[in-house]
């Protein structure tokens, strides 16, 4: 058989291929020749053939038939054969294949070889793809090589020990004596790998962490020698001595100093020295400074040192490198809650980053800007953020609008400013706001009695001839329906009043009804507003009757139903019309803050009080409001029955802000109303017994498929179902919340509501934190009683904190499998 071609010739031949098919033909031809050579047990050219096979593997072609040949090369006595054999083993084998176990004896022999380069090959292979069984068998040889005087072997053995610890953590103590001595080595390679080994051991074992804290002075001394040493061509990178080792030591110091006063105090001086003496003209210096900042912020450092670290991040914001600006913004966002005042000094620079062309920097700057808002700077920050909202890309508008809403609600200096700000957002980015923006603004307007005339006049002018922003049109329609008499009378004292007639007001609402841009929900708002004006206007009642009667034959079923009901109100119940359509009472907002929630003031000296009038004394009557909700189709709700009463009261109508909906949300068990604040509800037996028994049913009906109820912004909610064969009216729904983003979602609260014909019980969740990268889930159980076997519908509300912002979203679940309710 002729000698096979060399690797270099094969590469040259493959590169001449003009098409993918031609390349595949060449590869297949060569693979056939290599297979033939392997079958003939050709030892002369085995090394050359395996090398060519590895090149084909790098190109993406299958090369698994060369695995056993790699083992034969490893067993060879020639160094060139061993080198290719070990390389092939690292590329073609892994611990999922049993073939790799055949290497154990060869690696053990090579670890005891007389040549350091053969020992190095064995260490590299074990550290790259050694399984837990191999690591357990060969850990003794690795520990022996850690104690050798050969620096070449010690650095490789240290990295191999890291792999052994990851695979078999219980072997960690075996390497403890040898690891201490590694820090006395002068060789930088050994120092670097020893720091990596120490870091791995400290991260995996609290006992090791406490044990190695006594090494902090020695690590500080090594770092100081690196900083103070003169020029060394062997380790110098852009004028800095071994920056890789410096970064590794700083990272280890961060782990050792976390939550430990003595260790933190021992490293304060050296951290200050690194922060002040490191050259920033090169990227290498910036890398060391960044690691220094992370260490300072993570340990119990002095306040002056923390200010120095934040000032370094502030200088990073002025750097021309976008990567440096991005990591600075990310680091400031992590530290803003603990060192808010120091970060506030760089507010103007952070706001300037909103104008950056890079979308990643722009998003981080937006998140950090919202974190800096407090009662002292709310006006200036909102001005900048509103300007940003007006000019930013569409993908930013939803998050920016939500952040402005939350900040305005928390820090608004006055009700008028609050209303103006939200109206500005709705005018600028109304199509991007969350679903709860409309009811929240309606509630705010309702509670601001002195601002009714001003608000309705502003909204009337805002929608003249422009119906593109549907949430704004919905709020305007609601306000015109409630306060249309104030608009016509021109009683506004806040700004120059406008002269509007009753017919002009109705013209606007009729235009909303017939506009092609109006959604079904918006038309519902407009029709209800026209109906309410029948009790506020005196000269246009007949026109209102005519409009309402026209929509009694609308193709929109929801609109038609409302029009028919309103027609019946005119004809049969006209004597009740004034009472049913009277002005909405003040709406109390339910807060869901748990007892352990920490109230953040974002660095303000005193909380900014909102300019409010004292609430009316005495309980508010609710019978008329309930009648109105019944008329509008919003009184068919069943509340969640709490698992245990709490001390937090909740108003009956606080969350029912969208009067056109037929389902509202109710609190989770943590925010359930006390027995004194809600009527007693007759509870079926399944809601009282066996709440903690597992499994929930002993006789489970099989075959109910699970569904994905919600999937948005990295958060996924899945429903799984169980039903009892003996009590088929009961459905147990287990929710599982998972998080695919890079950061945890904290303060997670899941709430649910069902129509009145159902009974619903929401049990306590397993946790309030949804781990990142889908590393865990939150589970929560819902019990639903459906005695009438009606199709199950549910509205869910999700609230959580993510990336420093409070998130909230509503969703309807209508895709329940028939097996779950029939």
Swiss-Prot record:
Widely expressed. Residues 593-627 are annotated as: Disordered. Residues 702-817 form the GAE domain. The keyword Plastid does not apply. One of its GO terms (biological process) is vesicle-mediated transport. It is a peripheral membrane protein. Keywords: Coated pit, Cytoplasm, Cytoplasmic vesicle, Golgi apparatus, Membrane, Protein transport, Transport. GO terms for cellular component: AP-1 adaptor complex; clathrin-coated pit; clathrin-coated vesicle; early endosome; lysosomal membrane; perinuclear region of cytoplasm; presynapse; trans-Golgi network. The keyword DNA-binding does not apply. It is found in: Golgi apparatus; Cytoplasmic vesicle, Clathrin-coated vesicle membrane; Cytoplasm; Cytoplasm, Perinuclear region. PROSITE patterns: GAE. Residues 593-604 have a biased composition (Polar residues). Subunit of clathrin-associated adaptor protein complex 1 that plays a role in protein sorting in the late-Golgi/trans-Golgi network (TGN) and/or endosomes. The AP complexes mediate both the recruitment of clathrin to membranes and the recognition of sorting signals within the cytosolic tails of transmembrane cargo molecules. Adaptor protein complex 1 (AP-1) is a heterotetramer composed of two large adaptins (gamma-type subunit AP1G1 and beta-type subunit AP1B1), a medium adaptin (mu-type subunit AP1M1 or AP1M2) and a small adaptin (sigma-type subunit AP1S1 or AP1S2 or AP1S3). Interacts (via GAE domain) with RABEP1. Interacts with EPS15. Interacts with SYNRG/gamma-synergin. Interacts (via GAE domain) with AP1AR (via coiled-coil domain). Interacts with CLN3 (via dileucine motif); this interaction facilitates lysosomal targeting. Belongs to the adaptor complexes large subunit family. This is AP-1 complex subunit gamma-1. The gene is Ap1g1.
